[in-house]
Amino acid sequence: MRQFKEIPFYNQIVDKGTIKQLIGRLVAHFGSTYTSHILDKLKELGFEYGTKTGISLGIDDLLITPSKKWLIQDAEQQAQASDSHYNSGNLHAVEKLRQLIETWHTTSEYLKQEMNPNFRITDPFNPVHMMAFSGARGTTSQVHQLVGMRGLMSDPHGQIIDLPIQSNFREGLSLAEYIISCYGARKGVVDTAIRTSDSGYLTRRLVDVAQHIVVRKTDCKTHKCISIQPFLEEWKMNIHLYVQQKLIGRILADYVLKDNRCIASRNQDISFDLAIRLLSFKFQSIWVRSPLTCESTRWICQMCYGWSIGYRNLIEVGEAVGIIAAQSIGEPGTQLTLRTFHTGGVFTGDIAQQIRSPLNGIIQLNNSKIRSIRNRYGQPAFVCLDNIHIKVKGKDTYQSIIPTESLLFVKNNQKVQAKQVIAEIRSTIRQSKEEVNKNINSELAGEVFWSNKYYFKEQNLHDLQKNNFFVKNNHNFRNCPTSDSQNENDSNRSNHFLTINSIKYSQEKTNWPISNTGHIWILSGQVYKFHNIQSIFYKQQDKVRIKNILAQKELLVNNGGRYHNFHSQRLSYFQENLMNNSYTHSKKKTKSLSSNFVNNAICGLTILKEKKGKFSFLKNSSFCKKTRTNLQFILEVKNYSRIKHNDLLATLHNPAHRTSTAGMVKYGFLLINSQLDKNLKSYNKNSRKKKISLYQNNQIQPGQSLFWIPEEIHEIYKPFSFLHVKNGEIIQKGTYISEDIQCGTSGLVEINKRNRNHYEISIQPGSLYFLKDKQIALQKDQILIAPGEKIDNTNISDEWLYLKYLKTDQGVSVLFARPAKEYKIDLINHLEHASSLETLYMKKCFDVRISHYTPYEDGQKIRNNAGAQLISASLVFKLNNQNLAHKAEISWTRIKFQRKISYYLQINLRDKILPYSYSLSELKKLKFNSHFSNKNKQINNIDEVILGDTIFHTPLLTKNYGCIRTFSRRRQDNKTSFVLLSSSDQLELPLPIIFFAFISYKRFFNKKLGLIGNLYTKKTKLRNSNQNLFLNLFFISWYIIDEYSCNFLFWGAFSQLIKDARNKYSHNCFPIIIKKAFFSLGKFLSKIEMKILGNLETELGQVISLCNKKIILRIGKPYLATRGAIVHPRNGETIREGDTLMTLIYERLKAGDIIQGLPKIEQLLEARRENVVELIVNRYFLDCTNLLTEELGMLLGSLWGFQFSAWASMERSKLDLVFEIQQVYRSQGVYICDKHIEIIVRQMTSKIIILGDGMTDGFLPGELVEIPRARKTNRAMKSIMFYKPILVGITRASLNTRSFISEASFQETTRVLTKAAIKGRTDWLKGLKENVILGRLIPAGTGSEEIILQRLMNLQKIEKLRKGKSKKYTTSKLDSLLFSKCKSAFLKRHPLNPYCRETFHFILKQQITNSF
């Protein structure tokens, strides 16, 4: 009789886990029958005492932890500190979110940990406490939501909502908390109705893929195995019991040795006691057998499977473990959806392992092994470069070893308190991370400025240096891109404001990667952005009032016709008269007169002898993008020549508008003859007249298109008999037209006879469409059709086509569709220029426009195979008001800079204009008030208008009083922006008493200098080394930042900067030293500097004004940008509130599917492309290949290295897939045995895909074949079959089996049966499903006749070996009885034909003999 060990006596309070262990031990010792009797007694005992106790559950039983109040207050203080650091620019948005999550998650976890001691102390028999902490019903997390706090929630996508729910269900939720709570929750009714069907379908697919897996033999004799790493698994799941459950029931694959002592032997099953013993020895890895490594082809052996979960013993031969595995995985799929968080997706996680100081003392460590970094929460820390020893010296001495790559929060010789966190251990587990982009939106409207720490990455410099744009170099904005407005202003300023060979940038670039951590400032201001502005009435530094007109929009005529028109072409004026300004320009006296009238639009009627405007076509034209690709205008005028209205200045031949073949031109528009001035300048050269004529007649308007129908044309000067092609013949590319001419394209041949022995042969590419209706074909003859239009009743074009009607010799109507290429002219932006008017308003008297024209007529054929310039562009001189000036003079300057030659044009108006003054009454007579009238106003006057005329104007008004700070104009998209700086955007602070420096004042001038203030000489005496740094410097009392430029220079009467020769500070302004802090013009003040000024508010900003007693700041907000962040606006550009400022790129751990559990399982089991396992396989293959190439390349060779890498990566993918599936289930409290998942994964990874083009091996390319079958084929065939392993989903694996009956019963029945009939496939009925379909007994089960026969054979083998007889088989009574039983059992199951019956005796005897 079997002797059992003594069962230990349990005298403790048991919970759910202890009950499981107790039942397992009872089954192992007494069997299932006796165990069920014991459990019945235990159940009756529980019901009896439960009834006597009278346990009930009420709302009063929900006791709230007393420590909740101060824990939440502490968390709120930490959250406020994070907000303060974020507003000061010390943290960015991601670090702030991480700190918030860490703070509230830690608070929630501490509150959860306080629940159990609180219940034990106050009410140990509390029903909620007994129910939850025993595991009878509910979890600790759910009770925590009842009596603690709900904490952080996650939305349906798994993202954490940064607003924690501080209340619990006992206290009740507020409206906002309830909405957030419901956002992550799911409805139970919908979930039950929809998700349960998905779970059932998952079970069906799993059963189909694994139904034939049956335990057929005892041992497959394999030496392959997998390793279980106890400590790694423990870190993964953080549950020691999980490792025991993975070990219990497994079979050891090798001997386990400890100090040359055998702990366990090969093929020994791991019991509960052995598992505890193995874990106690702390082995790094334990090698066990697994279904993944079983050598059996279509089934599995007993040793590789291990224990039966139900009986705690080895699985019996004949068990259908495939169906058991499918049901064990599919059935909890219902639980995945039904027992998920109906109360919402509560964020749960583990607190990082931290090391705390056990006592008060001083830290001692080696500084050479640490390096300062910024941790993921934005806090300063130190990373350990190696394992370091740390000591805490106090009353006692505490020593510890900090592993490498851990984080230290203390430094050497620092005092620490008891329980203070001194280090954080980095996890050694390879955690799956994903890269996330976080868009940061601006919380302030204004201007964008980059700090001086930003530099481009080295790999971007080569691309950036190709462009012709300079950047100013000042002490606050270095080596960063500037806006277009700064480039415009720079062209009119002196050269010492520019830094040559500085970092350049491309105007097309909209994303700027940051290589160093720094700040991006947004300075406050009201932003006005306009599109398609024709008239702008203000410049920088102009002051405006409320509802002043900033600019105006004009509605232009797009087509000719009769429109409502205004009589007056003049602008309205201000109410006040401006002063007459006299100035000297080029030694000629000029006067200007401006007036102000009722509608607040600034305008000026100017009396002048000379007016200059400079143009830089290289830098400021709308063709700047094309100019950067080395496109250049060809000047058509002489230097210092006179020009008139509508004269051509230069032409441009764009290669993008040049064709590469011969062909035909078709207009995609109705030709509009330009209304040019009749008095065009006459030129001596004929080419000049020809270009003017072409410009007049064939001008192309913006938005119009030309079409090019390509063809190939050859001229043959030979008799017709020498031609190798016929008219109407379709030839291919490379066909010889004659003996020495070969065509370069495919198409239809058209032969035209010019003269005798002179033929023109045209090869026209295209397609032929036969039409029955001749009238329809004639209607579509010689027309263009757009993409998406019908060619005939059945065909739709996918590109521009040119249709041509043809008729065959048989009289059939054919449409010949030839491809047409579109050349479209984009909308034209007028060139900007700077003027020298000295009034507040600058009105354009002239303009230079770009006009496009074509030299070819509609339908004209170009016979040159080299192509032609289809469209040309011209610069045309326009006078906006011909009453002011009639003639002009043009000159150009040739400038060479850095091996590049640029031409700058200058146009001077030469005609003298008589002064004229309008009175208010005269302006009213001229109806100036109607100029800015509402666009909905009915206008009675009707006049004939043409293309380009203005119908009416729309004014754009200001909203507040202030000063224009920035004027930016971008030509690419015709956008104009202003920043209006008002009093609400500024902050005035008094300067405190100066303690650090002793300053004496001496009045130098008593005269007031307006905004500049008074002039003083200050003698500054400084202590220590700075004593003589600022002695006897020439200071200005009041400094104002130059609002016109981004360089922080002075403007006004005294702008000279005098510095001491020994001054080492590279500031462009005089600093004021207060309490060891420098306050200089243009400086961005930090929070510490604001506290020195006495400002306790949160506003930060930039110094724009300094005086003796006060400092004026422009309010701003800093944003921290870390390395790798992408900044969208350029430096100096405007941004509105809510616009995207930058994109932070950071890594985060991939969140488990808290809500979407079942779809995650389907994604893994179906091996979809977004599967994480596929990415892991590819990365592991590359890593393994590199390792083998470097270390074992000479030994193995590259071919064997790749083969080994493929095998290793596929083996690794199996384990990763098992872990990913297990992780989803365990995240929701469902435990599934690893062996069951391994059986399914084995079926998913047991196939290969055929490679190659031929069929020499009997398989088609792309066909799925089992791995053993492919290896047998390779051994049998002379030619090697190439294949690669593949990860197949369960649905695809079910449709690629050896049984076509099983495949047809699953999906695609017609296709599977048809394919099987064509191939003549044979189904050997080896699976369970096909036998059930045909009504046969299934070949599985411990009581099946085949299994009984196998057992008898094994018993006979054991008996023979025990008696020591020879292996030769001898007949005896036992043998005869065994033979007869096997024969009867086999013939009952398989009704064989006579041939099989005759050979059965020999086959059965041979099998029995071989088994011995």
Swiss-Prot record:
Record keyword Transferase present: yes
GO biological process terms held by the UniProt record: DNA-templated transcription
Subunit structure: In plastids the minimal PEP RNA polymerase catalytic core is composed of four subunits: alpha, beta, beta', and beta''. When a (nuclear-encoded) sigma factor is associated with the core the holoenzyme is formed, which can initiate transcription.
Catalytically driven reaction(s): RNA(n) + a ribonucleoside 5'-triphosphate = RNA(n+1) + diphosphate
GO CC annotation: chloroplast; DNA-directed RNA polymerase complex; mitochondrion
Molecular-function GO term, any one: DNA binding
The protein's name in its UniProt record: DNA-directed RNA polymerase subunit beta''
Matches recorded under HAMAP family: RNApol_bact_RpoC2 (MF_01324)
Keywords: Chloroplast, DNA-directed RNA polymerase, Metal-binding, Nucleotidyltransferase, Plastid, Transcription, Transferase, Zinc
EC code(s) of this entry: 2.7.7.6
Comment on bound cofactor: Binds 1 Zn(2+) ion per subunit.
Main location: plastid
Cellular compartment(s): Plastid, Chloroplast
CC cofactor: Zn(2+)
Signal sequence bounds: none
Origin species: Chara vulgaris (Common stonewort)
Function text: DNA-dependent RNA polymerase catalyzes the transcription of DNA into RNA using the four ribonucleoside triphosphates as substrates.
Keyword Transferase included in the entry's annotation: yes
Family annotation (InterPro entries): DNA-dir_RpoC2_beta_pp, RNA_pol_Rpb1_3, RNA_pol_Rpb1_3_sf, RNA_pol_Rpb1_4, RNA_pol_Rpb1_5, Rpb1_funnel_sf
Family: Belongs to the RNA polymerase beta' chain family. RpoC2 subfamily.
Record: residues binding Zn(2+): 220, 294, 301, 304
